[in-house]
Every structure is written in C-alpha cells, then in structure tokens.
C-alpha cells in the first residue's frame, strides 16, 4: 500500500501540472471559437456561459496542480498559455484573411473583417494582445541552432506575419496603439541593455522616431476625426458623471442610462461647441474600461483594478521569461483605455490567462508555500463564485432571448397588439434588455395603452440613454392630453442630442395643438427643422420639413 501511495504521488507530481496547463489554456482560450448565429451578436450569451463553465473546471485544476507541484505547474501553464494563444491568434488571422478574400462571411453587415467576433474593433484588440507574445518568442529563439528552437522560431514568425498582415485592415487605432506599446515593451525587456546603448549613441535617431510617432498619432486622429472627437466627448462626459457620483451607481442603471443623463445635463447647463453637439451620440460603452467601472461600481473599484494590474506588471518586469505575457497584459491595459475589452468574453479569456500566468509566478515568489496556497485558495473561491453567478445570469438571459426572437417578428411586422400581449409575458425576464423595453413601450403606445407605455418606457430609461425613448414618451403624453409632460420629455430629448431634428419636429406638432398652441415656440421649432443641417439628408428629413411647411401654412404663419 505504501509503495502504491508513493507511485500515485509521483504520478500526480508529473501529471497534474500538465492537466492544469492543458485544461486551462485549451478550454479558456477556446472561448473565441464559440459562436451562435441564432442570437443577437451583442448578447454573446453562449461565449459567457462557456467561459463561466470552463472556469469552474480549470480553477480547481490550477489549484490542485499548484499544491502538488507549484514550480512545474507555473512553468507548464506559462508555456502552454503562450502557445495556445498564438495558435488561436493564427486561426483568427487566417479567418480574417479569408473574409477579406471573400471566402468566409463577415459577422457584421457594415464591415468585411470581423474574424469570429461581431465587430472589427474587438477582433483587432484580440490580435493585438497575441502579437507581443509572438514577438517575444521570435526574440528568444533567434540565433539558436537546435531543431526544436528553430521550429519554434519559425512558428512564432508565421504567427507574427499573419497578425501583421491582417491587423492594419481592422482600422482599429486602439489596437494599433496597443500593438506598438506592447511590442515596444517586449523589445525593451529583452534588449534593454542594447536599447539603452542605442539611445545614448543615436539620440537624433531616437528623436526622429518620436517625431514619426507624433505624425502617426496625428494621422490616426485625422483618419477618423469625428470618431476621435466623439471618444473625447464620451470621456469628458463620463468624467463628469464620475464626479457627480464617485461611489458608483446605486439604482441598478446601466452605463448607457447614466451617460445619457450626464450628457443631457452637460448640453443643458454648460457651454459647448458645435463640434461637440455634432459628434454626440448614445454609446453603450465609455470606450475606457477604467472610467466605465468607476461610473458603474465606484472609483475605488477602478483604482483597485488598476492596482492589481500594476502589481502583475511589476511581477512580469522582474522576470525576463515573462516579457511575452507582460507584453500581452500591457496590450490589454492600453486597449482598455480606448475600447471595451472587458465586455467581450473572448478577450476576457485572454485577460484571465494573462492574470493566471503572472499571478502564478508571483505566488512562487512567496517563500512560505502555505501562505501562497491560502492566497490562491481565496482567489479560486472568488473566481468560482463569480463564474457560477455569471453562468446563471447569462443562461437565464439566453433562454429569455430565444423566447423573444420569434415574438419579435410580430413587432416588426406592425402587429403591435399581438406583440404587446406576447412582450408582456416576457417582461419580467427581459426588462434588462434596452431594445426589448423600447419595443414593448412603443407597441403599447401604438395600441393606445399610454399609461402602461409610460411605465415601461421609464424602465427603458434605466437601461438605455437613447433619446428615442423620450420621443415616444412625449408622443404618448401628447396623445393622452398631458401636454406639459409631453413638452418636458421632448425638450429633454433635444438637450440629450442637440443635433437631432426629429424631437424638434415633434415639438412643432405639439405646439400646433389647439389646446396647447404657442405661436412663438412653434415658429422657433419650425425654423430649426427647416434650417438645421442634418447628419444625413434622408427622405425622412425631407418629409418632416414638408409637413412642417404644411403646419405653418395651416396656421397662416408662412
């Protein structure tokens, strides 16, 4: 029996690290390949469920491997994570090249290149996170003559070339910047002595590189100037929202709803430029994860996250063999300043792998193993709790959305009474979804259930900042004879997005009501509708202007 126990311990000593490494990287990394075309692309329910489910398996495996053989587990996990991420990065790059060539379909009607993602931005961010790993592997195997090193060198080179060939086509400035910063980090970590010597001997060359960098940044800005100005405005208004409530949201509202209210206050109370009004929108994300976390959960949570990431970066900085994973983390941190990678499960899987590798290396530095195991155990328990909760959340949401999809056909076909009846059955399950709440409220408005429509649309205001909700609230109040309330809602809509013509058109119709007629206000709003420069001069704009002219003619004010 004793011999058998010794043999079992030796077997576990050898096998558990590999089991932890393979399970961890294969299952978590595979999140990027999980898709379900039958669901709305922005839900990503299947990916969240997959990632949550596999984390309940891999976290205990990681803990067991660390307890049995910490050094070997950390080493194997680090190596397998890098190679698996490069493998999935190569698959994504090939998929993207196939989409450019027309072999594979895109997942977005407006973009040719998306990979397995629904948008080229997250797709490019994923590739940007893998790129520094491939660069690091090339550097460490460069010049080595043994067969295994040569094979690894050329495999890494293939991955790097594939990513570099497709990354520019994604047109994601955030991903480009993350790639440059993270690859620069890897070069500095591997060749820091040579870089330091080069800088001291070739200062003018370094100055030239800095000037080129500034030119690159300027070109990236002017390439999509309105988009860049819009992001700056989002950051400005998000910061104001944080200043109003630094402890985070207490009423369960989403970022979109909080931002919509903050933008409305900004355009009401502050002096703003015409360019700000022109680029204003209704974003679902802050395009800066640190700011968005501060808005939703409080500044302290954002500071805690940044602190953890900086500690992990310091761990990577203390060990040269972690330069690749350190570059991966740097890429993700930079990308998070300009995008929303924590809302994309495939990129969250890369975050998790980077954190697991670097935290594992940090735990090995702790001299007393029992302290390290205690820390790891608490992390695993917290991770398991979060995984179970997230799986339950997205499992319920996915089931509800599957029930909603066939019913939604009624709404889009104009059968509003039947749609409202079916939406009522799903309301408790779907009240978190902004499109569902808007459609349900509009269907109730169309069927004359104005009181109920107002209740549902006010709920929609807690999950969305879209001013169209205010427009429907205004129309509903007008139809029910509550003209002052209708005016309040429509004026709020004009302040939320000042460049929108539609709410001004609705105000023209409101002020033309015999019971609420106001000549001065009617003329003011009519002049805006007739003279404003719309972003898109569509048929709808021309029809609204013609109707306004008819109203003015009827009131004998032309």
Regions found by a protein language model. Give the residues of each.
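Internal/C-terminal transmembrane anchor helices
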Residues: 201-220, 368-393
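Interfacial juxtamembrane loops and adjacent helix segments
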Residues: 240, 251-295
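Register position in tetratricopeptide repeats
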Residues: 412, 446, 479-480, 513-514
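Short coil turns that delineate tetratricopeptide repeat
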Residues: 431-432, 464-465, 498, 534
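Alpha-helical transmembrane segments of multi-pass inner-membrane proteins
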Residues: 11-37, 50-66, 76-109, 115-196, ...
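Alpha-solenoid helical repeat scaffolds
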Residues: 404-405, 435-439, 468-475, 501-506, ...
